[in-house]
């Protein structure tokens, strides 16, 4: 697969991931954790476990909610979650915390090549750059869904 086509497929996978995120909004987060995840307060070293737990709650929310075991999420989905929920001031930290995931095509083909934080960060930036209309007001949209479901 050519480099351009591969990047296009990855981006389209990330777009599909954002649509899944918007449709489900099943998060295993308290209001405090959601505020922590989306706030402009810079995460420090002691926040690492909470930050990972919050990002993972967005990635695996539906599975956790119904009690199914987790399976590794692809980079495209993790990048979409980070782009959608994490405040820009903490995106680099979120990518560092979540490094080690695999791109979808590697999972499908059985190739092990975990991404480093820098690659996840670059891909997350690409997702944000291509989805400004989707990401605009995303936080408020999610808050409204959570309120409607009685979570907040």
UniProtKB/Swiss-Prot annotation:
Changing residue 61 to E: Confers a lethal phenotype. The keyword Lyase does not apply. It holds the Pfam family gpD. One of its GO terms (biological process) is viral procapsid maturation. It is found in: Host cytoplasm. Keywords: Host cytoplasm, Viral capsid assembly, Viral release from host cell. Changing residue 61 to D: Confers a lethal phenotype. Gene3D superfamilies: Scaffold protein D. One of its GO terms (cellular component) is host cell cytoplasm. Belongs to the microvirus D protein family. Assembles the procapsid by joining twelve 12S pre-assembly complex into a T=1 icosahedral particle, called 108S procapsid. Ten proteins D bind each 12S complex, which are formed by three pentamers of F, G, B protein and a H protein. The scaffolding protein is released from the provirion after genome packaging to form the mature virion. Component of the procapsid particle composed of 60 copies of the internally located B, 240 copies of the external scaffolding protein D, 60 copies of each of the viral structural proteins F and G, and 12 copies of protein H. This is External scaffolding protein D. It comes from Enterobacteria phage phiX174. The gene is D.
